[in-house]
């Protein structure tokens, strides 16, 4: 690169040499000759100098009045235009306002501009070549601030540390969320009821959608001022919208009045029967036989149970054949009379094929079905009660099919007939529009009864029971009923001492009726037995309660062990063994008071095993007596009271405030388990239990390995790495502890249904108060269904400063 010595003087006797390409590299400094005086300068040149000085003064004045108006000038680069500029030129075109950047850049550019403008050639000094250096206010401020560089560095350092701290905290929060998510997954594997499973599906779906949103690039825009636009509010789907009705803060309606206005769209009937395709045949005696649609539909019902044990039961087959023949034509009845000659295999194969087709549906096909169901919910799933939108619980009428029953139900195999509009009674407000029946049909009856809570009613064909369409458990009507139930149980707590004294005195009554009532009430109080209703064993399953116990259901032992593991025997032992509600076996050995034991011996004397134990007592008589002791008291209130008080006492006994959340939840589940055992809320061990436990054991094994590796890494770590290794080790130890707790919880509750007592018998305010006191998230113990149903309890408990005590 050639260097031409071009000297621009700054008027102070020094000049700097630059290369002609505009590079800033300083080559050398030379001493300037003194500037020529006015007398030596020609008059024309002097006029030009004066003119230039006036311009400079004007610039200074403008710069002083508004610092933002003036910006350091920059020499035009001749290279830009592709032509060389005369070095000595003083043309105004050689100046171009410099774009304002940072203060540092302003200072640097100002210096460069000053040096460029003050270059002077080695020859005669020309006035046009003199360009005085002008400093803007910004530049002066920069010069003043120059000594404070250390403060700026310190400020930057602090800012850097702050950002690091924020990043570290963010990372810790993320790790905490990850741990919570992992714990949630472990907990989710142990969901004990269908409500938990439904809720979990919703959670997974929500997490999946959130993950999809995170994977998308951010589309947020900023306005001119650099501020982010406010996020758009998420609009709820119409079907998700239900009025949050704080009915517990309103005045109560007159006694017996459930609603003032009620509007709904009636029930949704089962879809019509779709005939079998022409290539699928029913065979009788090895020959193909064409059936009428009514007969063919019922044949499909039986084909659906071919692989089930029901098809091997004599009672089931006998009842099915009897009901099936009722719908057959005369010709069909003459030919079909032996179920063993009926061949349903082709129909069964077709049904299995259809199931596989449904499983293999595309995403779009499944979405279409989902949208159709959502559309049905919008129409039939909402009722308007007193101006508030409330969910309807079961708006779909059950389709026809075969009655299976629980246990050895005597009516298993009978046909559940198709319900038609002509079978249905509608209940709605007088001033509201009556639901329209399907075209060509009419309702059996339309009522306007505001003393009942059902929307529709009909009688089913097998058991002759009334079926109802009701509002969702989260509705006001259901909530009021629950609130009254638990308040009655709380009132019982204040009177239970006197009631117990009363029935204890009645153990010795001279009247056998009073003795039986007192003894039965003792079992209802101590064992939380159901009352039991009289049933015709030929019409219903042989399930019993306290009042309907038979001699064959109990055994007496003067002394015996209550459990196989017990070392000592107890006196006056009674063994109960019978089928309770839903044909669930109740087996229990208890030690009773001596007077109760003697009474049972008296009640059993001279009776056959099939005779009633309490032959002078029934449920109605017992409930009448209870109402005389306390207003609103029934056998069910005793059950609710004992369930609630047991949970509260167990929570006080088991909860350790120093435990982590997982350990506290284990304590809660153990307390809940005692309630479930008391109420005999059992369930069958799930088919996938063993597989699930194996997976959990493998997780524990893998986690132990991780803990061991982390421990080794901690021992070898030094300096800053040691703190990081310690955190990792502690985190893994905590995860292992939670997995072990989950294993214990899962194993203990494999045959116990915790959800039933939580949903129907335990005062929810006990649980809410416990969560509040021990800082346990309510979602850990209450599913979405629980939280919606007990919205009133959550609000009442959390809004009160006092701790709730049952």
From Swiss-Prot:
The chain positions of domain Topo IB-type catalytic read 474-803
Q: Mind listing the GO molecular function terms for this protein? A: DNA binding; DNA topoisomerase type I (single strand cut, ATP-independent) activity
Q: Which Pfam families match?
A: Topo_C_assoc, Topoisom_I, Topoisom_I_N
Name the enzyme's class.
isomerase
Q: Which cellular compartments is it found in?
A: Nucleus; Nucleus, Nucleolus; Chromosome
Q: Where is the composition biased (Basic residues)?
A: 49-60, 98-108, 159-176
Where is this chain compositionally biased, Low complexity type?
A: 1-15
What GO terms in the biological process aspect are recorded for it? chromosome segregation; DNA replication; DNA topological change
SUPFAM superfamilies cross-referenced by the UniProt entry = DNA breaking-rejoining enzymes, Eukaryotic DNA topoisomerase I, dispensable insert domain, Eukaryotic DNA topoisomerase I, N-terminal DNA-binding fragment
Tissues where the protein occurs: Expressed in male germ cells and in mature sperm.
Is Isomerase set as a keyword in this record? yes
Cite the PROSITE patterns for this sequence: TOPO_IB_1, TOPO_IB_2
Catalytic residues, chain numbering: 761 (o-(3'-phospho-dna)-tyrosine intermediate)
Q: Where is the composition biased (Acidic residues)?
A: 113-127, 138-153, 189-199
Gene inactivation effect: RNAi-mediated knockdown causes abnormal gonad morphology, enlarged sperm nuclei and aberrant progression through meiosis. Oocytes appear to have undergone endomitotic reduplication.
Q: Which EC number(s) does UniProt give? A: 5.6.2.1
Interaction with DNA as annotated region, ranges:
467-468, 530-535, 634-636
Query: Ranges of Basic and acidic residues compositional bias?
Result: 24-34, 128-137, 177-188, 210-229
Which CDD domains does the annotation name?
A: Topo_IB_C (cd00659), Topoisomer_IB_N_htopoI_like (cd03488)
* PANTHER family in alphabetical order: DNA TOPOISOMERASE 1, DNA TOPOISOMERASE I
The Swiss-Prot or TrEMBL record describes its family as follows: Belongs to the type IB topoisomerase family.
The miscellaneous annotation reads: Eukaryotic topoisomerase I and II can relax both negative and positive supercoils, whereas prokaryotic enzymes relax only negative supercoils.
Q: What name appears for this protein in its UniProt entry?
A: DNA topoisomerase 1
Gene that this polypeptide is encoded by: top-1
């Amino acid at each position: 690169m050639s260097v031409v010595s071009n000297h621009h003087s700054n008027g102070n006797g020094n000049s700097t040499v630059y290369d002609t390409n505009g590079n800033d590299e300083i080559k050398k400094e030379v001493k300037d000759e003194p500037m020529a005086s006015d007398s030596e300068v020609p008059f024309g040149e002097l006029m030009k100098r004066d003119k230039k000085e006036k311009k400079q003064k004007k610039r200074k004045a403008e710069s002083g009045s508004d610092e933002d108006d003036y910006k350091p000038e920059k020499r035009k680069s001749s290279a830009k235009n592709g032509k060389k500029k005369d070095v000595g030129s003083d043309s105004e075109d050689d100046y171009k306002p410099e774009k304002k950047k940072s203060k540092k850049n302003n200072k640097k550019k100002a210096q460069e501009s000053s040096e460029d403008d003050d270059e002077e050639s080695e020859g005669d000094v020309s006035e046009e070549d003199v360009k005085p250096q002008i400093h803007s206010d910004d530049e002066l401020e920069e010069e003043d601030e120059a000594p404070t560089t250390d403060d700026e560095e310190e400020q930057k350092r602090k800012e850097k540390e702050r950002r690091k701290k924020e990043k570290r905290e963010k990372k810790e929060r993320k790790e905490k969320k990850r741990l919570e998510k992992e714990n949630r997954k472990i907990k989710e594997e142990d969901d004990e009821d269908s409500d938990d499973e439904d809720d979990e599906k919703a959670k997974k779906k929500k997490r999946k959608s959130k993950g999809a949103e995170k994977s998308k690039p951010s589309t947020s825009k900023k306005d001119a001022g650099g501020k982010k636009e406010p996020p758009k509010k998420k609009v709820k789907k119409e079907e998700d919208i239900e009025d949050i009705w704080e009915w517990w803060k309103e005045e109560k309606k007159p006694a017996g009045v459930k609603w003032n206005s009620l509007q709904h769209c009636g029930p949704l009937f089962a879809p019509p029967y779709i005939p079998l395709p022409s290539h699928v045949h029913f065979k009788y005696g090895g020959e193909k036989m064409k059936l009428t649609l009514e007969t063919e539909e019922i044949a499909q019902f039986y084909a659906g149970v071919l692989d089930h044990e029901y098809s091997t039961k004599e009672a089931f087959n006998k009842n099915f054949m009897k009901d099936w023949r009722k719908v057959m034509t005369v010709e069909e009845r003459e030919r079909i009379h032996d179920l063993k000659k009926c061949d349903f295999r082709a129909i069964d194969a077709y049904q299995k094929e259809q199931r596989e087709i449904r499983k293999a549906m595309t995403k779009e096909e499944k979405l279409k079905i989902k949208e159709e169901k959502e559309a049905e919910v919008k129409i039939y799933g909402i009722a308007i009660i007193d101006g508030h939108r409330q969910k309807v619980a079961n708006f779909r009428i059950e389709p026809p099919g075969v009655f299976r029953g629980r246990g050895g139900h005597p009516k298993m195999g009978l046909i559940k007939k198709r319900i038609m509009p002509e079978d249905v009674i509608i209940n709605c407000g007088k001033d509201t529009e009556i639901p329209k029946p399907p075209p060509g049909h009419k309702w059996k009856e339309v009522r306007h009864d505001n003393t009942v809570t059902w929307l529709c009613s009909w009688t089913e064909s097998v058991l002759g029971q009334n079926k109802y369409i009701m509002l969702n458990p989260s509705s006001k009507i259901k909530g009021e009923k629950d609130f009254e139930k638990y308040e009655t149980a709380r009132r019982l707590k204040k009177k239970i001492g006197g009631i117990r004294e009363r029935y204890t005195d009645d153990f010795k009554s001279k009247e056998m009726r009073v003795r039986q009532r007192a003894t039965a009430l003792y079992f209802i109080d101590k064992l939380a037995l159901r009352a039991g209703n009289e049933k015709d064993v030929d019409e219903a399953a042989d399930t019993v309660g306290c009042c309907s116990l038979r001699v064959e259901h109990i055994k007496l032992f003067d002394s015996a062990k209550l459990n196989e593991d017990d070392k000592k025997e107890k006196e006056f032992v009674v063994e109960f063994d019978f089928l309770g509600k839903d044909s669930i076996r109740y087996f229990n050995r208890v030690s009773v008071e001596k007077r109760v034991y003697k009474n049972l011996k008296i009640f059993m004397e001279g009776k056959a095993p099939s005779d009633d134990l309490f032959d002078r007592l029934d449920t109605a008589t017992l409930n009448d007596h209870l109402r005389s002791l306390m207003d609103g008291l029934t056998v069910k209130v005793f059950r609710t009271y004992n369930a609630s008080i047991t949970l509260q006492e167990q929570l006080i006994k088991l909860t350790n405030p120093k435990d982590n959340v997982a350990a506290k939840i284990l304590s809660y589940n153990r307390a809940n388990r005692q309630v479930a055992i008391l109420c005999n809320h059992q369930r069958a061990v799930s088919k996938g239990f063993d597989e699930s436990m194996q997976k959990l054991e493998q997780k524990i094994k893998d986690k132990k390995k991780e803990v061991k590796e982390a421990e080794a890494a901690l021992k070898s770590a030094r300096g800053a790495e040691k703190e990081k290794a310690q955190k990792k080790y502690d985190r893994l130890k905590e995860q292992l502890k939670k997995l072990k707790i989950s294993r214990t919880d899962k194993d203990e509750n494999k045959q116990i249904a915790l959800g039933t007592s939580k949903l129907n018998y335990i005062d929810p305010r006990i649980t809410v108060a416990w969560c509040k006191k021990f800082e346990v998230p309510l979602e850990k113990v209450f599913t979405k269904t629980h939280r919606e149903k007990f919205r009133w309890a959550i609000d009442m408990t959390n809004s009160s400063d006092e701790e709730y005590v049952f």
